[in-house]
């Protein structure tokens, strides 16, 4: 009997002792980089959802090694961040100690699953030797003007005691913990991601990524073409610009709206409206951007008392303020055309503002008309369709110095400051004379000091502000300064970790350029779709900055991306609070790591979300036990069943073996593991029915199954008499000629009625088929006492005997 507990331990020990999965560097071989999104090492450890993506990259890595590639398949830890700090605050433990313990537990769990990681390349984002280079990248951005300080409206979470980025807010609450978010102005470090908006957008087209992820990034970047139009404020020298994607509707403007926080609001509000305006601003000042836009179902606003002049026809239109206009998007002002915009229509209807039709079509009594149509009431645009009218209006605006063609983006610069302890220190010093300087490169890493009190201060400072010995500095000229006390967000270290795996022990540079050239871009990156507009966008941005600096040789980091689905329990996401977490350690103890790996790959398509079945691993174990019994003599576990596995080939399994090698290889490459495993089951069914199994096919099959069930296949490989690991045994090939049936079934009819059938070699001669048909006992019965008048032979199909 196969004992998974002893066999799995044996091979895990063997792989570790022999450095089996050390990254190859044979210059004659091609290179393949298979990457997992590295985990945050939480105290909860792994649940069965984690190994799904990890098993997929492991199968590919193992196949590529067997196909003769140098394979880079590393693992590391996204170790900084809020969850560890929250846990440390709750328990009073040191976050560094907590992190180390969690990593040790995660690593033990991963090794029990038999993943073929090169542990020599392990990285941890909270290790000073690692974050030295995170800080170095920040310094290069600072020198290029891509990292800057600004007083900006931020998403402040009092419960977390820190700012969170737009990308970290889900449905108006913090993604981590689901806490409310409020708007406030704070001094923050920003990274100028907007400088890369066009490239981040355009280069998506070259990537082999799931279309929904690319679409989410396109929408997040939100490029829109239109015009910037200048409105003058009546009886004033003030002006304001609006960005619009519909300059063709300028004749239909019936009011304008400013962002409540716009400085202009205070300057133009009339005395009669001042109280109402101030009251409104106070009411909405703590709302987050999302609450004001996407989640804002009810339109609110106040008239300022001021009017603006429409530049195209000189008409006066009222100036309102409303929370749906953001100071941070576009120009912080909009022109409203209620007849042809749904949001403007709702606002105008609520506040009784005019609705001026300028395009034919629709019923304005019921709703805005947003489609294409002929322009009316629009002077020189009358009769034109939307696109022609847009072009003509932009020409008019430019000719009259009233506006210009403009491209706008929804993307904002990245808010890079966190008011927390457990993150990378920002290597900046603020001097008493008002200047700012970087910590010299040769003094990096700027280490995170040990602190016993890491409670958030509730102010724009992090707990580091309390460590005065660390904060206060004096330069050689006696000038006093203070270190930056905000830390970087946990997205910083994960924005470039895939580069460090390539050269993890380099203390002279982030990574050697020639090595980066050899391995980049990452060939396959597997992880959750929830990272579409955070990690994946941030990493692309950092990579492009590093490309411009000449640090990396490619424009993009990840050539092929794949999102695995969720493994659910009782149709819900697994979580401790729901009590529905399945621990992989328990499954491994009972059924073995190979059974768990195989079940997770066999559940369904890799990108589908599927419900966990507690009996699933038992069924894959049953299949693996069948494989074991077929190839290993149960009485002598070191021998093969000689009478079944032979050196001769009678051809019986030729076709199914060729089909299996072809399908498994192609399906693995396409990440269709469930159908590859189905085909292996087809082969085993055929092999069990066959009189004998050619040794070549038995060994070939073991190589095919090894990436999925590596422990058992290593053991069988050894039973077959091989001394070395199966990991580098050459991947099987097949003879395409054998995909075609070598035998066919011939139907035999007597006077048009089916009376028998037999197997014959494909394309047998007509006379041979006739002879065989006439000799069949069952056919003879129907020919008794009759004369055969004629025999019609259709090769490979039918022999029809006419007898009277």
UniProtKB/Swiss-Prot annotation:
The keyword Membrane does not apply. The keyword Cell cycle does not apply. Coiled coil: none annotated. A motif ('HIGH' region) lies at residues 39-50. It catalyses: tRNA(Leu) + L-leucine + ATP = L-leucyl-tRNA(Leu) + AMP + diphosphate. ATP binds at residue 576. GO terms for cellular component: cytosol. It is found in: Cytoplasm. Signal peptide: none annotated. Pfam families: Anticodon_1 (PF08264), tRNA-synt_1 (PF00133), tRNA-synt_1_2 (PF13603), tRNA-synt_1g (PF09334). Keywords: Aminoacyl-tRNA synthetase, ATP-binding, Cytoplasm, Ligase, Nucleotide-binding, Protein biosynthesis. Its EC number is 6.1.1.4. A motif ('KMSKS' region) lies at residues 573-577. One of its GO terms (molecular function) is ATP binding. One of its GO terms (biological process) is leucyl-tRNA aminoacylation. Belongs to the class-I aminoacyl-tRNA synthetase family. This is Leucine--tRNA ligase. The gene is leuS.
